[in-house]
Every structure is written in C-alpha cells, then in structure tokens.
C-alpha cells in the first residue's frame, strides 16, 4: 500500500482520531441498521488492544452546516455502538475545544456536519480537529471522495495519518478487481440513469471482457440498438453515447449482452402485471421494468466464465416482486460463481440482502459515491492525502 495502515503505527497511549462512517438510519431515537457500525469494530478494537484512546467522528444525514439539529444527533449511534462493543461509549456534544479521553476509552463526537467549515475543509476547523489527537485514522471509504475537514483537512495537519482496517480492506478488494483482475472479468452496471454511470462504463470498457447493463441504463442501450422502449425510463440525449459504447466494445472484443427479452407493465406499480416480451415487441404504452428469462439465461451463462465480477446496480425494479426475477437470477449467478466478486452501492446491497447472498459475495463495499468514483478511475482526496503524508 502506498499509505500507512493502522498496523504500521504505534498507538500506545496515543489519542487516536478515527473518521468512521456511522451515517446510519435512526428512527424514534433508535438505530435501525447497524451494518456500518459493525464494519468499524475491528479498527476500534485494534486501537483499544494496542493501548490507544479512541475518538470517533462521523456525519449523519444532511443537516444545515453549523446548526445543531437533534434529529441528526449521533447520540443514539453512541448507544448502539456501546451495545455492540459491550463497553461504555462517552458522547461529546461540544468537542472542538478538547476531548477528555484516556487509553482504553471510547468517545463518540457529535455530528461533524454541525461544525462550520466542515464541507469546505477550512484550515481553521481542520487544525482544530487535528489538535485533538496524535494519530488520525481514516476508516470511512464512503466519504473518501469528499475533501472535508474530518476526512481530508485533519489528515493534513495531524502528525500521523493512516488508513483503518475497513478502508484498507476496501482498497485492497477494489484494486484486486480493477488493477490486477483474474481474467476473464465481468462488470454489471445497473441503475436508472446512464448519465450518472457514463464515465464508469467508459473506464470499465478497457478492463473487462463482459459488460452487463441493467435498469434504465439497459433501456437506453435497447433504444440505441433501434428498438422502441415505449414508456420506459431511458435517456434520449444519451442514445448516441450508448451507440458509441457498443461500437467501442465491439472493436475491443467486449461482450455487452443487451437484453433480448424484457418484463413490461402498463404502469409503475408493485401490483402491475409483468408481461414477458421480446424487445422488438414492446409497444408505446408499456414500460420495461425487468429483463426477461432469455436474457437471464444469457447473463448467467456469461458469468459462469468469469474469474472476477464487479457489481454495481440492479437489472430491474427488484423492489417490486413481480419485477425482481432478473436481479434475483443475477444475484444467484454471482452467488454460485467461483469468481472473486466485489459489490457496492445502496441498491446492490439491498438486492444482496433481499436474495440472501451476503456470504457468497467475496467483498461488499459499504460505499456509494466513493465506490463509483473509484470505478471511474478518479483519485479520491481522502486517500490521496494519506499517500502524501506517507511520503513526507
């Protein structure tokens, strides 16, 4: 790794500032999904075992910066963490002027987004945060694409900055899939809009042998192949881009299996009847909400040949059971594959949970935007600053 990891750093009797991703759902003062909290436990436990004091920082939701708002308070998260780790977790509401913490203790700081200057990573705020600790640990890959005070600025001014266990695992898994993949490699890029994934598709074309498109993205490709998509979600102004991607794929020998059959409905509704049709038979008042059985078979067959699979996005409206078959078939094909598989993005994780394949995916990324930017080949500011610190 081109940056320091937690295990490279002496933590004994050090105040260790850890940027975690505790942006979790809270309802009636209770955390309803603890996945992101659980993901940070190895880093927290390691620091405690090494004799360090833990100061945790995170954002929660999107409050108005510099204004306290109780609905975005991290106090319920501190309670949930205490239950999971079976240790007291102190909560610091006002923490910028100093945090009282001893070796072996954990303090959860209030929402970083209540601080003025967080998003712009002002020098004033960054220096203030850096002064609270001896070591900074970045362990929130989900926010690594943002140069903010608690992810980037603090690393600039603190004596030692390194990557936590979760962040290190994320980078290793993604680099294994993208920089040194075992071939053949397949990528699945789904979701509603091609515009948000265009640079991902272009970046992956040079790396994969199979590129599977799904959702609204696939509809734009179906249109690019000259078929009518009726009332379906697609992007007319990006049909030309889709045509270019298909031509480029052909020249590079990349297989893009555009759906040959689909499940359509007359309305976007959970109870709408799913009708299976060839793509050539879709009419004006129908909308494509899932791929059909033939397309499922083609995808499953292609994935059997892959040694590396990268998955971001569903291939249909899997939240509606009538239109979940395509994403279910895709999920099961990945689960049954011998390939090294990496999955990321909110909808993808929801599909993994719905179809019960969590243990069959090699690595599940907790990130959304940062995962996408990594797939685009972009540099992530919070990772770059760790690399710079390692050189100094």
From Swiss-Prot:
Pathway: Carbohydrate degradation; glycolysis; pyruvate from D-glyceraldehyde 3-phosphate: step 2/5. It comes from the Bacteria. It is found in: Cytoplasm. GO terms for molecular function: ADP binding; ATP binding; phosphoglycerate kinase activity. One of its GO terms (cellular component) is cytosol. ATP binds at residues 197, 319, 345-348. Its EC number is 2.7.2.3. Substrate binds at residues 21-23, 36, 59-62, 113, 146. The keyword Kinase applies. It holds the Pfam family PGK. It is an enzyme of class 2 (transferase). Keywords: ATP-binding, Cytoplasm, Glycolysis, Kinase, Nucleotide-binding, Transferase. One of its GO terms (biological process) is gluconeogenesis. PROSITE patterns: PGLYCERATE_KINASE. It catalyses: (2R)-3-phosphoglycerate + ATP = (2R)-3-phospho-glyceroyl phosphate + ADP. HAMAP family: Phosphoglyc_kinase (MF_00145). Belongs to the phosphoglycerate kinase family. This is Phosphoglycerate kinase. It comes from Francisella tularensis subsp. mediasiatica (strain FSC147). The lineage of its organism: Bacteria, Pseudomonadati, Pseudomonadota, Gammaproteobacteria, Thiotrichales. The gene is pgk.
């Amino acid at each position: 790794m081109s940056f320091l990891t937690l295990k490279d750093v002496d933590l004994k009797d050090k105040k260790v500032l850890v940027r975690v991703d505790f942006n979790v759902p809270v309802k009636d003062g209770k955390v309803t999904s603890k996945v992101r909290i659980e993901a940070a436990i190895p880093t927290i436990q390691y620091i405690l075992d090494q004799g360090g004091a833990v100061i945790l920082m995170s954002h929660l939701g999107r409050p108005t910066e510099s204004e306290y708002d109780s609905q975005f308070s991290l106090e319920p998260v501190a309670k949930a963490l205490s239950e999971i780790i079976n240790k007291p977790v102190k909560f610091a509401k006002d923490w910028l002027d100093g945090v009282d913490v001893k070796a072996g203790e954990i303090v959860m700081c209030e929402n970083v987004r209540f601080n003025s200057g967080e998003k712009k990573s002002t020098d004033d705020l960054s220096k203030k945060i850096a002064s609270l600790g001896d070591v900074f640990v970045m362990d929130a890959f989900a926010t690594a694409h943002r140069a903010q005070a608690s992810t980037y600025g603090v690393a600039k001014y603190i004596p030692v900055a390194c990557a936590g266990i979760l962040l290190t695992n994320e980078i290793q898994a993604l680099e294994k899939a993208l920089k040194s993949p075992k071939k053949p490699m397949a990528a699945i890029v789904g979701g509603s809009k091609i515009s948000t994934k265009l640079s991902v598709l272009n970046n992956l074309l040079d790396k994969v042998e199979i590129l599977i498109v799904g959702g609204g993205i696939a509809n734009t490709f179906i249109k690019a192949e000259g078929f009518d998509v009726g009332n379906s979600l697609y992007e007319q102004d990006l049909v030309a881009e889709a045509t270019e991607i298909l031509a480029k794929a052909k020249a590079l020998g990349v297989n893009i299996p555009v759906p040959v059959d689909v499940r359509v409905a007359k309305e976007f509704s959970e109870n709408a009847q799913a009708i299976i049709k060839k793509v050539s038979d879709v009419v004006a008042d129908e909308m494509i909400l899932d791929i059909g059985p033939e397309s499922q078979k083609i995808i499953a067959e292609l994935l059997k040949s892959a040694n590396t699979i990268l998955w971001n996005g569903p291939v249909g409206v899997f939240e509606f059971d009538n239109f979940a078959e395509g994403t279910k078939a895709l999920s099961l094909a990945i689960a049954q594959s011998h390939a090294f598989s990496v999955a990321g993005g909110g909808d993808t994780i929801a599909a993994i949970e719905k179809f019960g394949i969590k243990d069959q995916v090699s690595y599940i990324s907790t990130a959304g935007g940062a995962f996408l930017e990594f797939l685009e080949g972009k540099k992530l500011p919070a990772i770059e600053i760790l690399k710079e610190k390692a050189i100094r």
